[in-house]
């Protein structure tokens, strides 16, 4: 018994060290991937930033030369105010002055981006009251949204993922793991087609300044809740049916986010991925381990109690024998 307990303890110790080692490699790999992304982005984007800075300096110098009555300080003050307004989603350009950022449809689009944590950043609250309400609204709304999405995804996953896999497994006798992998791949392909490629083609037509790559980039940035805000639909000059367009985009973002979560949940339920994820988790104490601990404690306690009981039995057995001998000795002389 003690050898089996010691052996199981050694196995648990080895598994815990292996999990810690795998977790260390995971942290190191993530940091290296983070550094790799920084190196690539810096090497690709830094030359374009430098060219843009040079172009702006030349444009500013040429403008001051053509307008000698305007000082550089006045120009910088004007540009600073324009950029500040632009950060709040207000543009001074004549072709963009007709679009309001806080009509009902735009506010509905903003609320959806806040609750989904996408947050494009092109429109932000201007007043202190709006900022305070945004904090309170988000504190309540984001957990509410997570609860809503979790419930919806769970119900959809049952009908879209689990039942089809079980049907093919039971009805046709296919391997459950193989069916799950094929189903996950097909579901991912359908989702990418319906929520990335087709909407990207639609956006490239509806948005004048967007090509297909930029439209696909917007779809990915939006449905992955990154929301950089460099591309926002419905902000063009004289956008036709802008209110209806904004409502359609809001519905697309909500449905697309649900579809993405369903696909992720489907892939996470794959046996291979579950096994891979467990490599980095802390091993839970199994019931049998707790039983072994209890049995070990009971073994130690019972051995002590057994020894004590044995000593008491010996005392009980010896006491009558001694008493009988003593009484016999006393009766002997009396009889004599």
Swiss-Prot record:
Q: Which organism is it from?
A: Pongo abelii
Instruction: Give the region (Selectivity filter 2) as residue ranges.
Output: 225-230
Instruction: Name the site position(s) for Part of a hydrophobic barrier that is stochastically dewetted and limits ion permeability.
Output: 146, 261
Q: Which Gene3D superfamilies match?
A: 1.10.287.70
Species classification: Eukaryota, Metazoa, Chordata, Craniata, Vertebrata
Protein family according to the UniProt entry? Belongs to the two pore domain potassium channel (TC 1.A.1.8) family.
The record's principal subcellular location, in a coarse class, is: membrane
Residue positions, PTM Phosphoserine: 326
Q: Which residues lie on this side of the membrane: Cytoplasmic?
A: 1-20, 157-181, 268-336
Q: Which reaction does it catalyse?
A: K(+)(in) = K(+)(out); NH4(+)(in) = NH4(+)(out); Na(+)(in) = Na(+)(out); Rb(+)(in) = Rb(+)(out)
UniProt-recorded name of the protein: Potassium channel subfamily K member 1
According to the record, the residues making up region (Disordered) are 315-336
Which ranges sit in the Extracellular compartment?
Answer: 42-103, 123-132, 203-211, 232-243
């Amino acid at each position: 018994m003690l050898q089996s307990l010691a052996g199981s303890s050694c196995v648990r110790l080895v598994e815990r060290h292996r999990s810690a080692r795998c977790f260390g490699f995971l942290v190191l790999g993530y940091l290296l991937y983070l550094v790799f992304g920084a190196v690539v982005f810096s090497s690709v984007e830094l030359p374009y930033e430098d060219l843009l800075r040079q172009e702006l300096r030349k444009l500013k110098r040429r403008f001051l030369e053509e307008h000698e009555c305007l000082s550089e300080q006045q120009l910088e003050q004007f540009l600073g105010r324009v950029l500040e307004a632009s950060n709040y989603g207000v543009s001074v350009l004549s072709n963009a002055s007709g679009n309001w950022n806080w009509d009902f449809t735009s506010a509905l689009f903003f609320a959806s981006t806040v609750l989904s944590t996408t947050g494009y950043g092109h429109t932000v609250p201007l007043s202190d009251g709006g900022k305070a309400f945004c904090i309170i609204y988000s504190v309540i709304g984001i957990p509410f949204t997570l609860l809503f999405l979790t419930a919806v995804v769970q119900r959809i996953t049952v009908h879209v993922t689990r039942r089809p896999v079980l049907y093919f497994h039971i009805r046709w006798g296919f391997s459950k793991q193989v069916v799950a992998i094929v189903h996950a791949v097909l579901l991912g392909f359908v989702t990418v087609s319906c929520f990335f490629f087709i909407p990207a083609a639609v956006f490239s037509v509806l948005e004048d300044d967007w090509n297909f790559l930029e439209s696909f980039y917007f779809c990915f940035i939006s449905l992955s809740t990154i929301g950089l805000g460099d591309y926002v639909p419905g902000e063009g000059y004289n956008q036709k049916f802008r209110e209806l367009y904004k409502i359609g985009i809001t519905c697309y973002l909500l449905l697309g986010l649900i579809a993405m979560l369903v696909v992720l949940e489907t892939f996470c339920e794959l046996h291979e991925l579950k096994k891979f994820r467990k490599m980095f988790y802390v091993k839970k104490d199994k019931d049998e381990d707790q039983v072994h601990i209890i049995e070990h404690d009971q073994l130690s306690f019972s051995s002590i109690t057994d020894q004590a009981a044995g000593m008491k039995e010996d005392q009980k057995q010896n006491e009558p024998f001694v008493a009988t001998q003593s009484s016999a000795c006393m009766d002997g002389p009396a009889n004599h």
